[in-house]
Protein backbone atom coordinates (compact mmCIF):
# COMPACT_ATOMS: atom_id res chain seq x y z
CA UNK A 1 0.00 0.00 0.00
CA UNK A 2 3.02 2.24 0.24
CA UNK A 3 1.80 3.91 3.43
CA UNK A 4 4.08 5.14 6.14
CA UNK A 5 3.05 4.79 9.75
CA UNK A 6 4.11 7.55 12.10
CA UNK A 7 4.99 6.33 15.57
CA UNK A 8 3.61 8.63 18.24
CA UNK A 9 5.94 8.02 21.17
CA UNK A 10 4.23 9.24 24.30
CA UNK A 11 7.04 7.57 26.24
CA UNK A 12 9.40 10.22 24.85
CA UNK A 13 7.90 12.85 27.15
CA UNK A 14 10.91 14.37 28.89
CA UNK A 15 9.63 16.89 31.40
CA UNK A 16 7.62 16.17 34.52
CA UNK A 17 4.75 18.24 33.15
CA UNK A 18 4.70 16.28 29.90
CA UNK A 19 4.72 12.97 31.76
CA UNK A 20 1.83 14.07 33.97
CA UNK A 21 -0.20 14.87 30.85
CA UNK A 22 0.53 11.42 29.43
CA UNK A 23 -0.47 9.74 32.71
CA UNK A 24 -3.65 11.82 32.87
CA UNK A 25 -4.67 10.87 29.32
CA UNK A 26 -4.16 7.17 30.00
CA UNK A 27 -5.88 7.37 33.39
CA UNK A 28 -8.97 8.94 31.86
CA UNK A 29 -9.12 6.46 28.97
CA UNK A 30 -8.62 3.43 31.22
CA UNK A 31 -11.31 4.71 33.61
CA UNK A 32 -13.84 5.16 30.79
CA UNK A 33 -13.00 1.79 29.22
CA UNK A 34 -13.32 -0.05 32.55
CA UNK A 35 -16.50 1.79 33.54
CA UNK A 36 -18.23 1.07 30.23
CA UNK A 37 -17.24 -2.60 30.17
CA UNK A 38 -15.87 -5.34 32.38
CA UNK A 39 -13.26 -4.48 35.00
CA UNK A 40 -11.47 -7.72 34.12
CA UNK A 41 -8.95 -7.20 31.28
CA UNK A 42 -9.28 -10.86 30.28
CA UNK A 43 -12.93 -10.33 29.38
CA UNK A 44 -12.59 -6.68 28.30
CA UNK A 45 -10.08 -6.86 25.46
CA UNK A 46 -10.19 -3.11 24.85
CA UNK A 47 -9.12 -2.58 28.46
CA UNK A 48 -6.44 -5.24 28.16
CA UNK A 49 -4.98 -3.60 25.05
CA UNK A 50 -5.08 -0.17 26.69
CA UNK A 51 -3.32 -1.38 29.84
CA UNK A 52 -0.61 -3.06 27.77
CA UNK A 53 -0.13 0.13 25.77
CA UNK A 54 0.05 2.24 28.94
CA UNK A 55 2.71 -0.03 30.43
CA UNK A 56 4.70 0.16 27.21
CA UNK A 57 4.58 3.96 27.49
CA UNK A 58 5.91 3.67 31.05
CA UNK A 59 2.73 4.70 32.84
CA UNK A 60 3.18 3.72 36.53
CA UNK A 61 1.11 0.81 37.83
CA UNK A 62 -0.50 2.98 40.50
CA UNK A 63 -1.97 5.26 37.81
CA UNK A 64 -3.54 2.27 36.07
CA UNK A 65 -4.82 0.74 39.31
CA UNK A 66 -6.29 4.05 40.48
CA UNK A 67 -8.24 4.43 37.23
CA UNK A 68 -9.67 0.90 37.51
CA UNK A 69 -10.52 1.36 41.20
CA UNK A 70 -12.32 4.59 40.33
CA UNK A 71 -14.39 2.75 37.72
CA UNK A 72 -15.09 0.00 40.24
CA UNK A 73 -16.74 2.52 42.54
CA UNK A 74 -19.43 3.23 39.97
CA UNK A 75 -19.70 6.95 40.68
CA UNK A 76 -17.49 9.60 39.14
CA UNK A 77 -17.30 11.74 36.05
CA UNK A 78 -19.23 10.92 32.92
CA UNK A 79 -17.11 11.25 29.79
CA UNK A 80 -18.29 11.11 26.19
CA UNK A 81 -16.24 10.53 23.07
CA UNK A 82 -15.89 13.32 20.52
CA UNK A 83 -14.18 13.16 17.14
CA UNK A 84 -13.21 16.09 14.95
CA UNK A 85 -12.11 15.77 11.33
CA UNK A 86 -10.36 18.86 10.05
CA UNK A 87 -7.60 20.05 7.72
CA UNK A 88 -4.28 21.03 9.26
CA UNK A 89 -1.36 23.05 7.86
CA UNK A 90 -0.75 22.52 4.11
CA UNK A 91 -4.19 20.88 4.00
CA UNK A 92 -2.98 17.70 5.65
CA UNK A 93 -5.87 15.64 7.00
CA UNK A 94 -6.31 15.42 10.76
CA UNK A 95 -8.54 13.32 13.03
CA UNK A 96 -8.70 14.34 16.70
CA UNK A 97 -10.25 11.96 19.25
CA UNK A 98 -11.32 13.36 22.61
CA UNK A 99 -12.88 12.27 25.89
CA UNK A 100 -14.93 15.07 27.39
CA UNK A 101 -17.38 15.96 30.13
CA UNK A 102 -18.22 19.23 28.34
CA UNK A 103 -18.63 19.08 24.57
CA UNK A 104 -18.81 22.85 24.12
CA UNK A 105 -15.55 23.43 25.99
CA UNK A 106 -13.76 20.69 24.09
CA UNK A 107 -14.97 21.91 20.71
CA UNK A 108 -13.84 25.46 21.48
CA UNK A 109 -10.41 24.28 22.71
CA UNK A 110 -9.80 22.14 19.64
CA UNK A 111 -11.20 24.77 17.30
CA UNK A 112 -8.89 27.39 18.82
CA UNK A 113 -5.88 25.14 18.19
CA UNK A 114 -6.83 24.89 14.52
CA UNK A 115 -7.74 28.55 14.00
CA UNK A 116 -4.56 29.85 15.66
CA UNK A 117 -2.49 27.71 13.30
CA UNK A 118 -4.34 28.65 10.12
CA UNK A 119 -6.00 25.24 9.83
CA UNK A 120 -9.42 24.63 8.29
CA UNK A 121 -12.52 23.28 9.99
CA UNK A 122 -14.31 20.35 8.38
CA UNK A 123 -17.37 18.32 9.30
CA UNK A 124 -18.01 14.67 10.21
CA UNK A 125 -16.73 12.41 7.44
CA UNK A 126 -14.67 15.18 5.83
CA UNK A 127 -11.41 13.25 6.06
CA UNK A 128 -12.33 10.03 7.88
CA UNK A 129 -12.96 8.16 4.63
CA UNK A 130 -9.28 8.71 3.74
CA UNK A 131 -8.09 6.70 6.76
CA UNK A 132 -8.33 2.99 7.55
CA UNK A 133 -8.99 1.73 11.08
CA UNK A 134 -6.15 -0.74 11.48
CA UNK A 135 -4.25 -2.84 13.98
CA UNK A 136 -0.59 -1.93 13.51
CA UNK A 137 2.48 -3.86 14.63
CA UNK A 138 6.12 -2.89 14.05
CA UNK A 139 9.18 -4.93 14.91
CA UNK A 140 12.74 -5.55 13.71
CA UNK A 141 13.04 -7.88 10.72
CA UNK A 142 13.73 -8.11 7.02
CA UNK A 143 11.71 -11.09 5.78
CA UNK A 144 8.14 -9.93 5.26
CA UNK A 145 7.37 -13.00 3.13
CA UNK A 146 8.09 -15.28 6.09
CA UNK A 147 5.92 -13.12 8.35
CA UNK A 148 3.05 -13.23 5.85
CA UNK A 149 3.36 -17.00 5.49
CA UNK A 150 3.35 -17.43 9.28
CA UNK A 151 0.22 -15.32 9.64
CA UNK A 152 -1.53 -17.15 6.81
CA UNK A 153 -0.70 -20.46 8.50
CA UNK A 154 -2.37 -19.09 11.64
CA UNK A 155 -5.44 -18.10 9.56
CA UNK A 156 -5.03 -14.39 10.31
CA UNK A 157 -6.57 -11.69 8.14
CA UNK A 158 -3.83 -9.22 7.10
CA UNK A 159 -4.31 -5.97 5.18
CA UNK A 160 -0.67 -5.34 4.28
CA UNK A 161 2.93 -5.99 5.31
CA UNK A 162 5.78 -3.57 4.65
CA UNK A 163 9.52 -3.82 5.24
CA UNK A 164 11.72 -0.74 5.30
CA UNK A 165 15.17 -0.17 6.84
CA UNK A 166 15.05 -3.40 8.82
CA UNK A 167 11.60 -2.70 10.27
CA UNK A 168 8.55 -4.79 9.41
CA UNK A 169 5.10 -3.24 9.72
CA UNK A 170 1.99 -5.42 9.76
CA UNK A 171 -1.44 -3.90 9.11
CA UNK A 172 -4.65 -5.80 9.86
CA UNK A 173 -8.33 -5.00 10.49
CA UNK A 174 -8.63 -3.46 13.96
CA UNK A 175 -10.89 -6.31 15.07
CA UNK A 176 -7.99 -8.73 14.53
CA UNK A 177 -5.62 -7.03 17.00
CA UNK A 178 -5.16 -9.84 19.51
CA UNK A 179 -5.38 -12.56 16.88
CA UNK A 180 -2.49 -10.97 14.99
CA UNK A 181 -0.48 -10.29 18.13
CA UNK A 182 -0.89 -13.85 19.41
CA UNK A 183 -0.03 -15.30 16.00
CA UNK A 184 3.14 -13.22 15.72
CA UNK A 185 4.19 -14.19 19.25
CA UNK A 186 3.48 -17.87 18.58
CA UNK A 187 5.43 -18.02 15.31
CA UNK A 188 8.23 -15.67 16.42
CA UNK A 189 8.75 -16.24 20.17
CA UNK A 190 11.52 -13.63 20.40
CA UNK A 191 9.59 -10.84 18.68
CA UNK A 192 9.75 -7.46 20.44
CA UNK A 193 7.10 -5.01 19.29
CA UNK A 194 8.17 -1.40 18.82
CA UNK A 195 4.53 -0.59 18.01
CA UNK A 196 1.37 -2.55 18.86
CA UNK A 197 -1.75 -0.43 18.62
CA UNK A 198 -5.00 0.32 16.86
CA UNK A 199 -4.76 3.45 14.76
CA UNK A 200 -6.25 5.39 11.88
CA UNK A 201 -3.79 4.88 9.02
CA UNK A 202 -3.91 7.36 6.11
CA UNK A 203 -4.33 6.08 2.57
CA UNK A 204 -2.26 8.96 1.15
CA UNK A 205 0.37 11.29 2.60
CA UNK A 206 0.82 15.06 2.44
CA UNK A 207 4.42 16.28 2.47
CA UNK A 208 5.33 19.02 4.94
CA UNK A 209 8.61 20.85 4.27
CA UNK A 210 10.52 24.08 4.90
CA UNK A 211 8.97 26.60 7.27
CA UNK A 212 5.78 24.52 7.36
CA UNK A 213 7.54 21.87 9.48
CA UNK A 214 7.88 24.16 12.51
CA UNK A 215 4.30 25.38 12.04
CA UNK A 216 3.00 21.82 11.89
CA UNK A 217 4.93 20.74 15.00
CA UNK A 218 3.62 23.78 16.88
CA UNK A 219 0.11 22.86 15.75
CA UNK A 220 0.49 19.33 17.18
CA UNK A 221 1.91 20.71 20.44
CA UNK A 222 -1.08 23.03 20.87
CA UNK A 223 -3.51 20.17 20.22
CA UNK A 224 -1.71 17.87 22.64
CA UNK A 225 -1.93 20.57 25.30
CA UNK A 226 -5.74 20.37 25.18
CA UNK A 227 -6.76 18.37 28.26
CA UNK A 228 -9.54 16.48 26.48
CA UNK A 229 -7.51 15.40 23.43
CA UNK A 230 -6.62 11.70 23.61
CA UNK A 231 -5.28 10.84 20.15
CA UNK A 232 -4.30 12.70 17.00
CA UNK A 233 -4.07 11.01 13.61
CA UNK A 234 -2.85 12.75 10.46
CA UNK A 235 -1.41 12.13 7.02
CA UNK A 236 1.46 14.63 7.22
CA UNK A 237 4.89 13.38 6.19
CA UNK A 238 7.86 15.51 7.21
CA UNK A 239 10.27 15.92 4.28
CA UNK A 240 13.78 14.69 5.03
UniProtKB/Swiss-Prot annotation:
One term under GO cellular component: cytosol
Molecular function per GO: DNA binding
InterPro entries per record: Integrase-like_N, TACO1_YebC-like_2nd/3rd_dom, TACO1_YebC_N, Transcrip_reg_TACO1-like, Transcrip_reg_TACO1-like_dom3, YebC-like
Superkingdom assignment: Bacteria
Biological process terms in GO annotation: regulation of DNA-templated transcription
Main subcellular location: cytoplasm
Pfam families recorded: TACO1_YebC_N, Transcrip_reg
Protein name: Probable transcriptional regulatory protein PBPRB1582
Native organism: Photobacterium profundum (strain SS9)
